[in-house]
Amino acid sequence: MKKIIACIGTFFALVALSTQAKNPYLLQTADRSAMEHWVDSVFESLSPKERIAQLLVITVRNSDTPQNRKTLQRLIQEQKIGGLLFDSGTAKDQANLTNYCQSLSKVPLMITLDGEWGLAMRLSDTPRFPVNMMLGAVQNDSLLYEYGRAVGKQCRCMGIHVNFAPVLDINSNPRNPVIGKRSFGESLKNVSSKAIAYAKGLESVGVMAVAKHFPGHGDTSEDSHKTLPLVPHSKGRLMSTEIPPFKAYIDSGLSGIMVGHLNIPAWDATN
């Protein structure tokens, strides 16, 4: 089974870049002192190898079979991984496997989801929400906040801590084969406001939001799951068009950002 190590391509850009990041939205109602005490105590109990392994989130099969359970047991008890991203499947299998995996782990596993419009993006037997392009036409952003809360509650029911959403890419290239309906639209302002409202809804119920695909995957013509798309624009264009939604997201105190698999010569011309 092919395994993808998500900690390299998927980078959590902690929002220490903004003043509000000193008090992230997700933690505004949390007991910071108690959390930090727990984290410090767990960290001190881990070996250097275990600390490194905590950075790894592995994509695994969502199939409740003896063979898959054996694979998961090895990853957790031998490799000491920090988290899981389940592939597509059913809610029943994922719930069973989540409970099984958590029972094996010395440190509670971080369970993640790539669910831009909720569980149904990955789990076949769950309630389905509209895709982002449809929601981009909604005039009232408070509805996007409530939508985010609904998705967050779905995640909580499944023991999911992190959702790799929202998409902050501006859908500016009609030849883009991979963003399209996943974007909230072609308006910079609309994408920013809709995505931030959705992310705040997620985080209001305790699910970490991870915006993507920094610094912007909207104006590409190739699929980053299959190759390395080129973003040919100048730094000036990037800072005026692609970057602003991510800056607004950071300034709102939201928690995580995923870096896209992109070739951006304006920032790094090396091959």
List where the protein language model places each region:
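Mature N-terminal segment immediately following signal peptide/propeptide cleavage
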Residues: D31-D64, K70
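Phosphate/pyrophosphate-binding betaalpha-module
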Residues: G201-V210, S224, R237-G256
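Enzymes and membrane/adaptor proteins characterized by extended Gly/Ser/Thr/Asp/Glu-rich
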Residues: R61-R69, Q73-K194, H213, G218-S234, ...
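Short, well-ordered coil/turn segments that N-cap beta-strands
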Residues: Q54, K80-G82, K106-L109, I160-H161, ...
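Short leucine-rich amphipathic alpha-helices used at interfaces
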Residues: K22-N23, L27-T29, S33-A34, T71-L72, ...
